[in-house]
Amino acid sequence: MSLNTPDVIICKAAVVRELGRSVMVEEIKVDPPKATEVRIKMLFASICHTDMLCFDGFPTPLFPRIPGHEGVGMVESVGEDIKTKLKPGDIVMPLFMGECGQCLNCKSKRTNLCHAYPLTLSGLLLDGTSRMSIAKTEETIYHHLSCSTWSEYMVIDINYVLKIDPKMHLPYASFLSCGFTTGFGAPWKETQITKGSIVAVFGLGAVGLGAIKGAQMQGASIIIGVDINENKAAKGKAFGMTHFINPKDHPNQLVSDMVRDITDGLGVDYCFECTGIASLLKEIIEASKIGFGTTILIGAAPDNVPISSLSLINGRTLKGTTFGGVRTRSDLPIILQKCMNEEIELDELMSHEIRLENIHEIFEILKKPDCVKILINFD
């Protein structure tokens, strides 16, 4: 097919049909892009914790669905209203939130949560419809967070797309479209920590490692990493961690006490919660300083979050963040450039690579202690 011929494409995608740990590669139809949309041929995608939650019906149990909101691809065709902005062959990152620059939130520069192009949970694009269907039955397929990157082709509104330098190492671009950037942004944009700050990062997956790197580049003096996987100690140190705590080594001691042991009994200025385990939050808050300690909730959890009012009455702050406070057009290009300049090295994130036809293997790979990031290679 010609790169600039907008027609229905039949391709393969990873489809989730029901609750549970099951995914199948099926033939689907991908419609042409509408006026303000882009159809993308995916080159790489990666697995994020939030993608795995959709197997459990979080945040909404919509099926059939194609997961995936991390990835990088090449523009295959564009809608009639955006031919001057993007063209076939451009390398782009599909994103799960946009930045209009004009709404109250965007103008305030206090948040990255755009009113015009928000994070969407409906499983549909901005006009309330889908661009994907099962090839044999025409059954509508739901998108995942405006994206669905676990497909050979996908359609997305241009306001959720970022054109990038084709010289960028493309697997890195996939990692930066959510996980690592979300962590990196939390100390950089969401809290804007100052030089000499003391921080603790709970959960050293891609998000947590990003938080460590962001804290290091902001000048944090002590960066404590907490994880029950001993393999993460080396990973954390590679990104700038100064101390490591494995709670399994101290079964009779509270994590908050172990953090205070490292910080002269005071706790840390900032805690970054990157586990997505709701039951841990109360203890994480307790690891921050009385009076002005701040905990940033990053990891998405399907359960209600239990917290102690006394912890907050004692002057602590709990704050949530999406994408680490990073604005998709104003801030994300800065992170991409830092990677191209080798200020940020992401080799330590890459642990496993699979083909789309082997997508079912992810459930076992994710259980491996050396797993950090799984890359789907469409080439």
From Swiss-Prot:
Biological process terms in GO annotation: formaldehyde catabolic process; isoprenoid biosynthetic process
Cofactor note: Binds 2 Zn(2+) ions per subunit.
Family as reported in the entry's similarity comment: Belongs to the zinc-containing alcohol dehydrogenase family. Class-IV subfamily.
UniProt keyword Iron-sulfur, yes or no: no
PROSITE patterns, per the entry: ADH_ZINC
Annotated residues for binding of Zn(2+) 2: C100, C103, C106, C114
Record-level Gene Ontology MF annotations: perillyl-alcohol dehydrogenase (NAD+) activity; S-(hydroxymethyl)glutathione dehydrogenase [NAD(P)+] activity; zinc ion binding
EC number: 1.1.1.144, 1.1.1.347, 1.1.1.-
Top EC class for this record: oxidoreductase
InterPro entries according to UniProt: ADH-like_C, ADH-like_N, ADH_Zn_CS, GroES-like_sf, NAD(P)-bd_dom_sf
Involved pathway(s): Isoprenoid biosynthesis
Reported cofactor(s): Zn(2+)
Protein residues bound to NAD(+): 49-53, 203-208, 227, 232, 275-277, 298-300, 321-323
Record's keyword terms, sorted: Isoprene biosynthesis, Metal-binding, NAD, Oxidoreductase, Zinc
Protein name: Alcohol dehydrogenase 2
